[in-house]
């Protein structure tokens, strides 16, 4: 069997810059949406975006979840979800508990990846809800029925799927009832409260998080202290930050749900070796990633299910299918050296530790241009190595107090490189935490990543024109007028991607109309036409071009149209014709070659060999 010898030691990903984008997140999510379907959810209303129109709390919850399901397909297509109504007339669950209805569609497990059919039918659930499911108060004192307890039980059973090591498990609870047992007798209320809180605690002990999305009445704010504070486990500090009023409007609720669903997830787990015999566990979070279209998935033409790719190796000599593990060869001194896949993996492994501390340097040694790619945020974890948090805090405090950053070796199966570990202190405001404490891992550049800036002027040897003080003053005034306050790159969605997803959504859900996408990257014409901005622009133009900015300099136009003769580039610094005759063009730098090409209006793109050939062609050699 013939294999390419040069391919033996080739990395799976030869571009080290791509390893950031191709990191696989360590876990997926299992999510259960719990929706209160009591009559109170249908009676209570709040103002909608449209004037003179009211929306029920049930409609708000359903709309938020429908939007979240569509976002799941785009952002986290591997996540699995389930939808569960409680306080219902009908029941549908494996435990056969009253007042709980698990909504699903055929050919799908109770908790599974969201499908187009699930989203389409859930979008229409309000039209058929009263007929097929029905609303009914499920907490009845005389019968000892407790639909909230049953819903937590059913949700916990649904979340048994998957391991905590590979998945995060969450419940999202939508309700407008802040005291579900308020109308009960004291003894019954205490008993139901105790059993329900115990059921919630049992779920949390299994690693399941419960998050509340409350809906407030127009004339009454949701009081979380009556019951749900204990159910979701809020302490006094967290209670002050919890804002139940966010559920008053549909858009607020959608925004709140989006923030909770798209929480930061672990991009990778790292073992940080501080010294021999001492290592701690860190979780790495990707702070910034490019938004790209999803990868292509091949489907079976008959079942429309993803196809499973199987690969077989066939011997070219015998035609037989290779059963044994494939070995690779590397020619060495007229011999073919055999390597197994495991041996190659060990050869390419640079170090056993993932991240190893080398030393410390002053923060002044770290320059802005050293940060060439998005950094990774590191935070300690005691999940595997007990005491990691304590050691991390001691290191973090010392680095901040001494104004030092750590230099570490980041290797393993990834291309090796040096990284800078910069401690970040916690930033708080009146509304709570703005930035968490932790360490930013900055990927330091290789030596050839840092290059001198090329200074290219129209006339080599002539000083570049400098702006006057008045021009600088006018430019600063213009920038102040055009400054975007509280700017964040997250405010602007990629318009091409948004349209791409809108088209996919319309095709998958058989929608007649394409969802309108707004291009936030277009200039703000209304803002640019403000009198103060227009005045600043005109003053800047006048300072640069004078009273008549449209008049072009004749001398400038003539100078631009002139073509310099071959060999006259760089004011005689080099005789390019002579260098071409003697074959010494290769001794010039790329910048010097581009100077000749620029002077003769030739292309300057390509490698050094391409530039030399282009000069030789122009000279006629």
UniProtKB/Swiss-Prot annotation:
Domain of life: Eukaryota
Top-level EC class as recorded in UniProt: hydrolase
Any one biological process term the GO annotation gives: response to heat
Expression sites (tissue/organ): Expressed ubiquitously.
Annotated region described as Disordered, given as residue ranges: 1-21, 545-569
Induction or repression: Up-regulated in response to induction of double-strand breaks. Down-regulated by heat shock.
Cellular localisation: Nucleus; Cytoplasm
Matching InterPro entries: Ku70, Ku70/Ku80_beta-barrel_dom, Ku70_bridge/pillars_dom_sf, KU70_core_dom, Ku_C, Ku_N, SAP_dom, SAP_dom_sf
Major place of residence: nucleus
Residue ranges occupied by any SAP domain in the UniProt entry: 585-619
Effect ascribed to mutating residue 319 to R: Loss of interactions with TRP1 and KU80
Documented EC number(s): 3.6.4.12
Phenotype of the disrupted gene, per the record: No visible phenotype when grown under normal conditions. Hypersensitivity to ionising radiation (IR) and to methylmethane sulfonate (MMS). Longer telomeres.
Cellular component GO terms held in the UniProt record: cytoplasm; Ku70:Ku80 complex
Bias (Acidic residues) ranges: 1-20
SMART domains: Ku78, SAP
Gene3D superfamilies: 1.10.1600.10, 2.40.290.10, Ku70, bridge and pillars, SAP domain, von Willebrand factor, type A domain
Domain Ku stretches: 273-471
Reaction catalyzed: ATP + H2O = ADP + phosphate + H(+)
GO molecular function, one term: damaged DNA binding
Subunit structure: Heterodimer with KU80. Interacts with TRP1. Interacts with WEX. Interacts with OFP1.
Family: Belongs to the ku70 family.
Biological function: Single-stranded DNA-dependent ATP-dependent helicase. Involved in DNA non-homologous end joining (NHEJ) required for double-strand break repair. When associated with KU80, binds to double-stranded telomeric and non-telomeric DNA sequences, but not to single-stranded DNA. Plays a role in maintaining telomere length. Acts as a negative regulator of telomerase. Required for maintenance of the telomeric C-rich strand.
Name of the protein: ATP-dependent DNA helicase 2 subunit KU70
UniProt organism field: Arabidopsis thaliana
Lineage: Eukaryota, Viridiplantae, Streptophyta, Embryophyta, Tracheophyta
């Amino acid at each position: 069997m013939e294999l390419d010898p040069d391919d033996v030691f080739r990395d799976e990903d030869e571009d080290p810059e791509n390893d950031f984008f191709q990191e696989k997140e360590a876990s997926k999510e299992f999510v259960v949406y719990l929706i209160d379907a009591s009559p109170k959810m249908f009676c209570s209303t709040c103002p909608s975006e449209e004037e003179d129109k009211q929306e029920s709390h049930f409609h708000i919850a359903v709309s938020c979840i429908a939007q979240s399901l569509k976002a799941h397909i785009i952002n986290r297509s591997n996540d699995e979800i389930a939808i569960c109504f409680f306080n219902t007339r009908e029941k549908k669950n494996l435990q056969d508990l009253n007042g709980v209805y698990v909504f699903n569609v055929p050919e799908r497990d109770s908790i599974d990846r969201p499908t187009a059919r699930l989203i389409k039918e859930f979008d229409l659930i309000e039209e058929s809800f009263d007929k097929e499911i029905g609303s009914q108060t499920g907490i009845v004192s005389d019968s000892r029925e407790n639909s909230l307890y049953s819903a937590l039980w059913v949700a916990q059973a649904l979340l048994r799927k998957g391991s905590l090591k590979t998945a995060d498990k969450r419940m999202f609870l939508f309700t407008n009832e802040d005291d579900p047992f308020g109308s009960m007798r004291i003894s019954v209320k205490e008993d139901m409260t105790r059993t329900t809180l115990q059921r919630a605690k049992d779920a949390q002990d299994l690693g399941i998080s419960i998050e509340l999305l409350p809906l407030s009445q127009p004339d009454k704010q949701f009081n979380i202290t009556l019951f749900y504070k204990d159910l979701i486990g809020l302490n006094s500090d967290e209670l002050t930050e919890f804002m139940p009023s966010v559920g008053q409007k549909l858009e607020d609720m959608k925004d709140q749900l989006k923030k909770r669903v798209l929480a930061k997830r672990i991009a990778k787990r790292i073992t940080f070796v501080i010294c021999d015999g001492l290592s701690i566990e860190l979780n790495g979070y990707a702070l910034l990633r490019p938004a790209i279209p999803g990868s292509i998935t091949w489907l079976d033409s008959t079942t429309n299910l993803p196809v499973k790719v199987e690969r077989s190796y066939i011997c070219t000599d015998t035609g037989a299918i290779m059963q044994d593990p494939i070995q690779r060869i590397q020619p060495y001194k007229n011999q073919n050296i055999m390597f197994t896949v495991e041996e190659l993996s060990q050869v390419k492994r640079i170090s056993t530790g993932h991240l190893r501390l080398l030393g410390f340097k002053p923060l002044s040694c770290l320059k802005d241009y050293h940060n060439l790619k998005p950094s990774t945020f590191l935070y300690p974890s005691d999940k595997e190595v007990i005491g990691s948090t304590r050691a991390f805090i001691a290191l973090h405090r010392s680095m901040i107090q001494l104004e030092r950053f750590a230099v570490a070796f980041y290797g393993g199966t990834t291309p090796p490189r040096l990284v800078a570990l910069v401690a970040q202190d916690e930033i708080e405001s009146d509304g709570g935490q703005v930035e968490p404490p932790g360490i930013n891992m900055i990927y330091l550049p290789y030596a050839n990543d840092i290059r001198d800036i090329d200074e290219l002027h129209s006339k080599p040897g002539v000083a570049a024109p400098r702006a006057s003080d008045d021009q600088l003053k006018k430019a600063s005034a213009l920038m102040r007028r055009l400054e975007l306050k509280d700017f964040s790159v997250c405010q602007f969605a990629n318009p091409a991607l948004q349209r791409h997803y809108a088209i996919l959504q319309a095709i998958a859900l058989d929608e007649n109309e394409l969802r309108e996408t707004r291009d936030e990257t277009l200039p703000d014409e209304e803002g640019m036409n403000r009198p103060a901005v227009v005045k600043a622009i005109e003053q800047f133009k006048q300072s640069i071009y004078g009273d008549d900015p449209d008049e072009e300099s004749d001398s400038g136009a003539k100078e631009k149209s002139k073509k310099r003769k071959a060999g006259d580039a760089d004011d005689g610094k080099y005789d390019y014709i002579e260098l071409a005759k003697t074959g010494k063009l290769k001794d010039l730098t790329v910048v010097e070659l581009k100077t000749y090409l620029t002077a003769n209006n030739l292309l300057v793109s390509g490698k050094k060999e391409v530039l030399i050939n282009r000069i030789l062609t122009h000279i006629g050699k």
